Amino acid sequence: MRILGILGSFLGAIPGVILYVLLTRINFYGSIATIIMYYGAVGGYNFLTEKLKKKNYDEIQERESRFNAIKKENFSSFSFLFSVIPSILGVYLAEVINFSIDIKAEYPESPIGEIVPFAMANVFSPEFNYLIYIIISCALVIISAVVLFYKSREMMKY
């Protein structure tokens, strides 16, 4: 069941990666999309594992209760903590895509097969300005994880 949740977590982070790249391309602060990336990863994990938990799955009742409150049986602590991994990998992927697009715009004659490995190897280089965005984005992912983890613990008490 966790394997399916892990797959859902990676799939749930994809819209955040796309939004991150789009916001960065229009010269907006793309790191805001990491919050969506993290919540998408948590939602993807819980969405795929929740259907397996219930043998008599009632979709209408699920839709009504999904956004009402966080209940202990709906969310697992593992999903909150594990979803940090796909989110941070998504930040790396989004920055590599942005860096590759910037290189391709500057050197249009270079093939993409050479650009992407160069971007993957040099995205952490202090010579380029991408490292600060990666640090800020990863910090936002971790802050989102901590806030969601503690808020869910607080809400589960009631």
Where are these regions (language model features)?
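Alpha-helical transmembrane segments in multi-pass membrane proteins
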Residues: 4, 8, 12, 16, ...
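Hydrophobic alpha-helical transmembrane segments
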Residues: 3-10, 32, 77-81, 134-135
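Transmembrane alpha-helix boundary/anchor motif
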Residues: 18, 39-44, 144-147
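Membrane-helix interface and helix-disruption motif detector
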Residues: 20-32
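C-terminal binding/interaction regions
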Residues: 73, 77, 86-158
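Membrane-interface segments at loop-to-transmembrane junctions
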Residues: 63-81
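Membrane-interface extramembranous regions at the lipid-water interface
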Residues: 1, 11, 15-16, 47-57, ...
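Canonical alpha-helical transmembrane segments
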Residues: 33-61
